[in-house]
Amino acid sequence: MARAQVLLMAAALVLMLTAAPRAAVALNCGQVDSKMKPCLTYVQGGPGPSGECCNGVRDLHNQAQSSGDRQTVCNCLKGIARGIHNLNLNNAASIPSKCNVNVPYTISPDIDCSRIY
């Protein structure tokens, strides 16, 4: 379960990293976890991401306005992914495209969050 959440968080982080900087919004891991929970079934090999999952990914993408927010989301996703058993990396990486969110990064548990701006 934790891995799925990490993958979902990674997807959200990638989405946030691609967002243009705007007014600062202090994001935390609790918020990231909450937005990504609906994606857990999918990252554990279940059927395609739900509408609720995609809404969470879009919300995170829109809320991650600053580099700091995007890096926070990235680190939160990595932490969550470490705890998910039966994590399907392909499903996790496909979330942005399946949710119609353009992310120019590959979602992975070993992404270097410090390189996200």
Curated annotation (Swiss-Prot):
Lipidation (Cis-14-hydroxy-10,13-dioxo-7-heptadecenoic acid aspartate ester): 33
GO biological process, alphabetically ordered: lipid transport
CDD domains linked: nsLTP1
Biotechnological relevance of this protein: During brewing process, structural and chemical modifications of the protein occur. Both unfolding of the structure and glycation should increased the amphiphilicity of the protein, leading to foam-promoting forms that concentrate in beer foams.
Disulfide bridges in this chain: 29-76, 39-53, 54-99, 74-113
Source domain of life: Eukaryota
Family: Belongs to the plant LTP family.
Protein name: Non-specific lipid-transfer protein 1
Species of origin: Hordeum vulgare
UniProt lineage: Eukaryota, Viridiplantae, Streptophyta, Embryophyta, Tracheophyta
Gene that produces this protein: LTP1
